[in-house]
A protein has these predicted regions:
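A short glycine-centered flexible hinge/capping loop motif at secondary-structure junctions
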Residues: 48, 156-158, 438-440
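Short cytosolic juxtamembrane segments of multi-pass membrane proteins
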Residues: 149, 247-259, 431, 440, ...
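Glycine-rich helix-loop "coupling/hinge" segments at transmembrane-helix boundaries
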Residues: 12, 191-214, 300-305, 473-500, ...
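Membrane-water interface segments at the C-terminal ends of transmembrane alpha-helices
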Residues: 1-13, 26-143, 167-192, 196, ...
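Alpha-helical transmembrane segments of integral membrane proteins
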Residues: 237-273
Length: 533
C-alpha cells in the first residue's frame, strides 16, 4: 500500500502524472521493458515446459537402470541459487564461455557469434533453471494418477494420443498450471539473468533497479505497481481458467507402476536420452567447479585457448579468507527462517485448526509476498520503513542492517505458513481428542501428539525458506549495506571486478552448503521433509 500511495502521490495531493510518464509513447522505454518482460516470461514458460514435461513422462513412466540417478541429476538446477546459476551459464554459454570457444575453434568463427545473448540467452537460462518446476509438479501428478482411467479408455478403443489428450492431460492440468504460474512470476521477477545476458534488451526488473538508483522514487513506485499487476493478473487468469476446467479422479483404482522398457531399438534410446539430458542438466555445475580451480589471469576473455591449462586451489583460499559474506547470509537466513517458523506455524494453526473468520482473506494476504517479484518486495520495504512507524517502533530501517533479513522473512513466510497449514490439515482430530480424554493438557498434547506429526512438513518448508534466503539476490541488490553484505552480493562484486575464478569458488561453496542442507533434511527429518524442500 505504501508503494501504491507513493506512485499516486505529489507535493500538492494526488496525481496520475507518474503513470502518464510510464505509459507515455514519446518515451517508450518503460512500455518496451514491460513488453519484453512479458515476452521473456511467456517464452520461459514454454521452454521450461518443453524440457520438464517430457522428462517427467520419461522418468515416471519407464523403469530402467540408473533412473533414480537421472531423476536426481535432472533436479540439480534447484540447488543453484539464481545468481550462481546465471554465472555458470555465462562461463558455459557466454561470449567467452566453453561452448562458444569450442565452436569457434572448430569453425574458425568469432566466439562472440556463437554465444547466447539477448532474449535467447535470458530464455535459455530461465528454461534450464525453471524446468525443474514442471518436472517436479508433473512427476508428482503422474505418480499419483489412477491408471485405471487410461486402462478403461484403452478398453473402449481409444488410441494413445486420444488417451493422452482426453484423460491424462486434463488430470495433469493443475500441475501444469501451477508450474506455469511459478515460472512466469519468477521470470517476471528475474534480475540476474537479464542483467548479465540481456545486453541492450530492456526488462522491467532491471529498469526498476536503474530507476531506483537514479533517485526517481515516484517512477520506481509506478514500475513496482505495474510489475506486480502483470504477475498477479497472470496468476488470477490461469487460476480462473483452471478452475473452470477442473477435472478430478472419482475412482478406487491404484497408482500405476512404471513399465519395463519395450524391446528393440527403443530399449536403448529411452535410457540414452535420459542420460544425455541428465548430463546436460549438470553442465553448468561442472563448469562452475572447473572455473573455480583455474588460476586467475590464465584463462581470460582475451585468451584464445578453448580449455584452461593452469589450475590451483588459491581461489578457494581467497574465498575462505573473505568468508564474512557467507557467514552473514547464513546468519540472516537462519534468523529469518526462525521467525518464519514461529509466525508460519501460528498462521497455519489459525487457518487449519481454528478455521478463523475471513480465513481466505488472511491466506491471500500471507501468500501475497510469494506472488510479488522480489524487487517489488524490496521497494515496498524501502518505502514503508523510510520513516519511523509503529511496526519498526518508531525507527527508520531503510539503510540499516535489519531490512535485508526482514525481506527474507517476508518473502519466505508463505512457504512455511503453507507447509504448516498442509501439515495441520493432515492430522486426524481423533488423535488429539484421545489425548485430551486421557487428561493431557494443551501443551502436552501439542508436544507429544501434534508436533511430531507436523514436524516433517513444517521443517521441510523451513528448509526451503532457509535455502531460498541463503542465495537470494533480487531483493539483496537493493537492500544490502556493507555491514551485512550477503554471499550473493560478494559473488556479484567479484564478477564485476573480473575475478571470475573467485566468484566461481564462492558459488561452489554456496552450492555445496545448500547441498549439505538438503542432505541433512533427508537424514534428520525423513523423506517427507526432503520432498517438501
Amino acid at each position: 500500500l505504501a508503494v501504491l500511495w507513493q506512485s499516486l502521490g505529489a507535493a500538492d495531493g494526488w496525481t496520475l502524472s507518474h503513470y502518464g510518464r510510464f505509459f507515455s509513447f514519446t518515451s517508450s522505454a518503460n512500455l518496451l521493458a514491460t513488453w519484453n518482460s512479458v515476452l521473456v516470461s511467456c517464452l520461459s514458460v514454454i521452454l521450461a515446459a518443453l524440457i520438464g514435461v517430457p522428462l517427467a513422462f520419461l522418468l515416471s513412466t519407464f523403469d530402467f537402470p540408473g533412473r533414480k540417478a537421472c531423476s536426481a541429476l535432472v533436479s540439480m538446477p534447484i540447488v543453484l541459487p539464481p545468481l550462481v546459476g546465471v554465472l555458470a551459464f555465462v562461463f558455459l554459454l557466454g561470449e567467452s564461455g566453453l561452448v562458444p570457444r569450442g565452436l569457434s575453434n572448430l569453425t574458425g568463427s568469432n566466439s562472440a557469434s556463437c554465444a547466447l545473448t539477448g532474449i535467447a540467452g535470458v530464455v535459455a537460462v530461465h528454461g534450464y533453471s525453471f524446468s525443474v518446476f514442471f518436472f517436479t509438479f508433473v512427476s508428482s501428478a503422474l505418480e499419483n494418477r489412477d491408471t485405471s482411467l487410461t486402462e478403461a479408455a484403452a478398453s473402449l478403443g481409444a488410441g494413445k494420443w486420444l488417451r493422452l489428450r482426453r484423460v491424462t492431460l486434463p488430470l495433469l492440468m493443475p500441475a501444469l498450471v501451477g508450474a506455469a504460474i511459478i515460472v512466469f512470476m519468477t521470470s517476471m521477477a528475474s534480475f540476474s539473468a537479464p542483467l548479465l545476458f540481456a545486453g541492450e534488451l530492456r526488462v522491467l526488473s532491471v529498469q526498476l533497479y536503474s530507476t531506483r538508483l537514479s533517485g526517481d522514487l515516484r517512477l520506481a513506485a509506478v514500475q513496482s505497481v505495474v510489475l506486480s499487476g502483470v504477475s498477479l493478473a497472470f496468476l488470477f487468469a490461469l487460476r480462473y481458467w483452471n478452475n473452470r476446467r477442473r477435472v478430478t479422479m472419482a475412482t478406487k483404482g491404484t497408482r500405476g507402476r512404471r513399465r519395463s522398457l519395450p524391446r528393440g531399438l527403443t530399449r536403448w534410446l529411452i535410457p540414452s536420452a535420459g542420460f544425455v539430458v541428465s548430463v546436460i542438466m549438470v553442465l553448468p555445475h561442472l563448469t562452475l567447479v572447473l572455473l573455480s580451480f583455474i588460476k586467475q589471469g590464465t584463462w581470460t576473455f582475451r585468451s584464445d585457448a578453448w580449455f584452461p591449462a593452469v589450475f590451483t586451489v588459491e581461489n578457494y583460499r581467497m574465498a575462505l579468507s573473505l568468508a564474512r559474506p557467507l557467514a552473514n547470509s547464513i546468519q540472516m537466513a537462519f534468523f529469518a527462517t526462525l521467525g518464519n517458523l514461529v509466525v508460519g506455524v501460528f498462521i497455519g494453526w489459525l487457518l487449519a485448526v481454528k478455521r478463523i473468520r475471513f480465513g481466505n482473506v488472511v491466506d491471500a494476504l500471507v501468500m501475497l509476498p510469494w506472488a510479488l517479484p522480489g524487487t517489488v518486495v524490496a521497494v515496498n520495504l524501502l518505502t514503508a520503513f523510510s520513516t519511523g512507524n509503529v511496526f519498526s517502533f518508531g525507527q527508520v530501517l531503510a539503510g540499516s542492517v535489519w531490512l535485508l533479513p526482514l525481506a527474507y522473512f517476508v518473502r519466505n513466510l508463505p512457504v512455511v505458513a503453507r507447509s504448516a497449514q498442509s501439515a495441520f490439515v493432515q492430522i486426524d482430530p481423533s488423535l488429539e481428542e484421545a489425548a485430551r480424554s486421557l487428561g493431557a493438557g494443551w501443551w502436552l498434547r501439542f508436544r507429544r501428539v501434534t508436533l511430531p506429526l507436523i514436524a516433517p512438513g513444517v521443517l521441510g518448508g523451513a528448509m526451503l525458506a532457509f535455502v531460498t534466503a541463503l542465495g537470494e539476490f533480487v531483493a539483496s541488490v537493493l537492500l544490502w549495506v556493507p555491514a551485512n553484505q550477503p554471499i550473493s552480493m560478494a559473488i556479484f562484486g567479484e564478477y564485476r571486478e573480473y575475478r571470475l575464478e573467485v566468484a566461481a569458488a564462492y558459488g561452489v561453496l554456496l552450492v555445496a552448503f545448500i547441498g549439505l542442507v538438503f542432505f541433512v533434511s533427508r537424514v534428520a527429518f525423513g523423506s517427507k521433509a526432503a520432498s517438501e524442500v
